[in-house]
């Protein structure tokens, strides 16, 4: 009888040993699987300075942004002045992101047009488009080929007008968007500026409307910006506006030109508005300044309203510009967002984050993360800009860690930084999933393009409601990882 406790103890120890061996085998197999499926195994830790080589760019080309902006005009057909392959790529990229068919025309360059210029192609295209599709506006954007040739789009459009190819009450606008410079964000900015250059007029009679240029954001974000203005009782002109264009409902009836988008009449009246709020310096600033110069409409350039502070600034600017008060509904939304931050702060605190995306989005997102005591330490954008780097340095000045900023940078450098200094969370577009898988890091999809999930065109990330959704996505990623890695004795039901 005296030996039974010792025998039982030995059995317990043997059983625990078996469990530990089993756990070690499982861990080893999991690591082995990860090693054998490394998708970016060529990425080295050693960082070599590169000036003339980009590996896995953190951006896409200007015409994609120009095409997206053009879709924000009601009854507009974007037109790619270049080869068929260029247009097919631009359309397919937007279609994969939005899961909606994106319509656009092309000048269909052949060898002859590539040598002698695309004037004949564009004049014929303008005639065909108005005859067959009857849009209100054709928005022409250039490509590498047509820019290299030196095609003069205003002159070609003028010839089409003189030849009677453009019907009365119809319009052809253009933006110069060569792919070998800038990015999709600068392409968006150029086409938005073209809307002002071609349409904005001043009658000398000021209206009570506020112009809002939303920046390169999702249709859901544009919808949310409009909703906030409506809640506050402010009359606005939002341009461009892709809501109800690239997130339109399924009605069972095909429409070449959906109901959404800013109308030509609204664009023409932007020159009489009280003021302009430009959200995002890079994507919206140029158009806002052009309105100020051409029509004397004063402008204020704000950060994208992502996160608590940036949304506060937007709501306050809207309140001051329209001389209205903030309604209780908006105050309630703000309080709910603040409540989430307060309740779950322990899970945000001190977490290191790596971000990649567009400059305007990264500025607001970095500020938001810092405000909830997270630490953005690797920040990469494919769009060059010294002002961006300066602003990020200001935002992350009190982060107790070295902060790496790539502007311009690429995904290869982004991955190298992460290898050398691991993080707790990744945020970026769908291409970041390869890094997330190889390095086994929680990942939140944010930005453009997102081709492997749905919801970004329907659920906003701007405003207080959008901020709550962003907090939820960040928390889900962090807490899912905590659940996955917690040993049995600390696997919690309530967090």
Language model segments and positions:
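An N-terminal assembly and electron-transfer interface module characteristic of large anaerobic redox
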Residues: 1-495
């Amino acid at each position: 009888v005296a030996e039974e406790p010792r025998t039982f103890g030995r059995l317990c120890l043997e059983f625990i040993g078996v469990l530990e061996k089993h756990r070690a085998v499982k861990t080893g197999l999991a690591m082995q699987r990860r090693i054998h499926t490394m998708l970016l195994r060529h990425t080295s830790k050693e960082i070599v300075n590169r000036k003339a080589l980009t590996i896995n760019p953190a951006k896409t080309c200007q015409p994609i942004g120009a095409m997206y902006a053009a879709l924000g005009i009601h009854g507009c057909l974007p037109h790619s002045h270049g080869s068929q392959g260029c247009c097919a790529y631009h359309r397919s990229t937007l279609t994969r992101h939005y899961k909606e068919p994106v319509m656009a025309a092309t000048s269909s360059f052949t060898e002859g047009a590539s040598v002698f210029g695309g004037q004949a192609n564009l004049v014929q295209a303008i005639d065909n488009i108005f005859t067959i599709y009857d849009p209100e506006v054709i928005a022409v954007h250039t490509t590498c080929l047509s820019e290299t040739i030196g095609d003069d789009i205003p002159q070609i459009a003028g010839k089409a007008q003189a030849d009677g190819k453009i019907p009365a009450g119809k319009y052809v606008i253009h933006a110069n968007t060569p792919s070998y410079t800038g990015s999709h964000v600068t392409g968006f900015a150029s086409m938005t500026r073209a809307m002002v250059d071609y349409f904005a007029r001043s009658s000398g009679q000021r209206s009570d409307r506020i112009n809002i240029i939303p920046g390169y954001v999702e249709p859901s974000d544009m919808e949310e910006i409009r909703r906030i203005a409506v809640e506050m009782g402010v009359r606005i002109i939002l341009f461009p506006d892709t809501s109800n264009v690239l997130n339109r409902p399924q009605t069972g009836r095909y429409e070449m030109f959906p109901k959404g988008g800013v109308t030509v009449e609204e664009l023409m009246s932007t020159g009489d508005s009280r003021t302009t709020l430009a959200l995002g310096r890079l994507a919206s600033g140029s158009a806002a300044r052009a309105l100020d110069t051409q029509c004397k409409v004063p402008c204020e350039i704000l950060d994208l309203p992502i996160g608590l502070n940036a949304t506060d600034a937007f709501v306050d600017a809207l309140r001051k510009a329209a001389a209205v008060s903030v309604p209780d509904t908006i105050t309630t939304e703000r309080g709910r967002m603040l409540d989430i931050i307060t309740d779950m702060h322990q899970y945000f605190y001190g977490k290191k984050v790596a971000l990649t995306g567009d400059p305007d989005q990264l500025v607001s997102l970095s500020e938001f993360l810092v405000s909830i005591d997270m630490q953005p330490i690797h920040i990469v954008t494919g769009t060059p800009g010294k002002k961006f780097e300066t602003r990020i340095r200001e935002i992350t000045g009190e982060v107790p860690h070295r902060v790496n900023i790539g502007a311009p940078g690429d995904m290869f450098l982004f991955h190298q930084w992460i290898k050398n200094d691991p993080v707790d969370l990744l945020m970026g577009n769908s291409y970041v999933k390869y890094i997330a898988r190889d390095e086994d890091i929680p990942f939140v999809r944010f930005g453009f393009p997102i081709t492997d999930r749905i919801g970004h065109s329907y659920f906003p990330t701007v405003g207080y409601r959008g901020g709550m959704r962003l907090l939820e996505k960040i928390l889900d990623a962090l807490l899912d990882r905590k659940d996955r890695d917690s040993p049995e004795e600390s696997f919690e039901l309530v967090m």
